[in-house]
Amino acid sequence: MTSLIRSNSWGSFVQTITSSSNRLYIGWFGLLVFPLLSLATVAYITAFFLAPAVDIDGIREPVAGSLIYGNNIISGAVIPSSNAIGVHFYPLWESLGLDEWLYNGGTYQFVVFHFFLGVCGWMGREWEFSYRLGMRPWIFVAFSAPIAAAAAVFIIYPIGQGSFSDGMPLGIQGTFNFMLVFQAEHKILMHPFHILGVAGVFGGSLFSAMHGSLVSSSLLAETAGSESLNNGYVFGQEDETYSISAAHAYFGRLIFQYASFNNSRSLHFFLAAWPVIGIWITSLGVATMAFNLNGFNFNQSILDESGHYINSWADILNRADLGIEVMHERNAHNFPLDLA
């Protein structure tokens, strides 16, 4: 009898977890997603408001990132783990106590690891839900792009640089600081993978705007002139709500014939694939720069036949990068040897 009750309870639990008719699909991955993301969110908000200063450079000069220490929404951040910790896994039980753990930036690892595992679980949940509904798996494939970007910035880059102190701070100003320092140290703007990523993101935005405007401009009129065109659409209707042939004809004549799609499926696959592939490539670029396979640099000035310098924008960019690098961790640098 007891085993029967347990069997029924387990069956009811499985039915609740895997049912695709729930208002919010949970799924087996959801059992990981919701606790992990909840812990990451609570820890992040708490640290953003209340965390003490962190010895990010490992030189006993802690940096404060919380609001209680005078920061605002722009300058506030969860400061990365101390350089003294390096790439060691640093849970609370590896420290002598909570004060030491906070001083060495253990909160950063806590938030990053829980967040990253949570969003990976979210990707798995997307696949699981698609599988339950008999859908194709492209939603979870598309979501792998931001997952790859998060892995590159929060996991691979700190490991490649030898310390989680090189990870991106979890704040607005910290993000921009990370971007500037990344350019100074790795010349990311001159890396071909970053260039392809920019083409992917901005190209995806352009294509999305073009597609949306074309569809909105070629809606099939199902209503009277005094009514909104939106009232002519019924959710779940079998008929198309716009004329793809009209949109194709317009765009083909606006630019040239083969710049336009005449197949709705290939069009939407292209709209999904272009930015996803671009972000994949950028993530790969950040992962390679993590191990100092950098973009093109201008460390050598241009010389004429007599050996005199020829001033160029390359020198300006190089000096700007050096200046940014000096300002970054200014007390940890040994000027000018660090610029060699």
UniProtKB/Swiss-Prot annotation:
The record marks 157 as: Tyrosine radical intermediate. The D1/D2 heterodimer binds P680, chlorophylls that are the primary electron donor of PSII, and subsequent electron acceptors. It shares a non-heme iron and each subunit binds pheophytin, quinone, additional chlorophylls, carotenoids and lipids. D1 provides most of the ligands for the Mn4-Ca-O5 cluster of the oxygen-evolving complex (OEC). There is also a Cl(-1) ion associated with D1 and D2, which is required for oxygen evolution. The PSII complex binds additional chlorophylls, carotenoids and specific lipids. A quinone binds at residues 211, 260-261. It comes from the Eukaryota. Its EC number is 1.10.3.9. Chlorophyll a PD1 binds at residue 194. GO terms for biological process: photosynthetic electron transport in photosystem II; response to herbicide. The chain crosses the membrane at residues 25-42, 114-129, 138-152, 193-214, 270-284. Tyr-157 forms a radical intermediate that is referred to as redox-active TyrZ, YZ or Y-Z. It catalyses: 2 a plastoquinone + 4 hnu + 2 H2O = 2 a plastoquinol + O2. It is found in: Plastid, Chloroplast thylakoid membrane. The record marks 186 as: Stabilizes free radical intermediate. One of its GO terms (cellular component) is chloroplast thylakoid membrane. It is a multi-pass membrane protein. [CaMn4O5] cluster binds at residues 166, 185, 328-329, 338, 340. Fe cation binds at residues 211, 268. 2 of the reaction center chlorophylls (ChlD1 and ChlD2) are entirely coordinated by water. Belongs to the reaction center PufL/M/PsbA/D family. PSII is composed of 1 copy each of membrane proteins PsbA, PsbB, PsbC, PsbD, PsbE, PsbF, PsbH, PsbI, PsbJ, PsbK, PsbL, PsbM, PsbT, PsbX, PsbY, PsbZ, Psb30/Ycf12, at least 3 peripheral proteins of the oxygen-evolving complex and a large number of cofactors. It forms dimeric complexes. Photosystem II (PSII) is a light-driven water:plastoquinone oxidoreductase that uses light energy to abstract electrons from H(2)O, generating O(2) and a proton gradient subsequently used for ATP formation. It consists of a core antenna complex that captures photons, and an electron transfer chain that converts photonic excitation into a charge separation. The D1/D2 (PsbA/PsbD) reaction center heterodimer binds P680, the primary electron donor of PSII as well as several subsequent electron acceptors. This is Photosystem II protein D1. It comes from Amphidinium carterae. The lineage of its organism: Eukaryota, Sar, Alveolata, Dinophyceae, Amphidiniales. The gene is psbA.
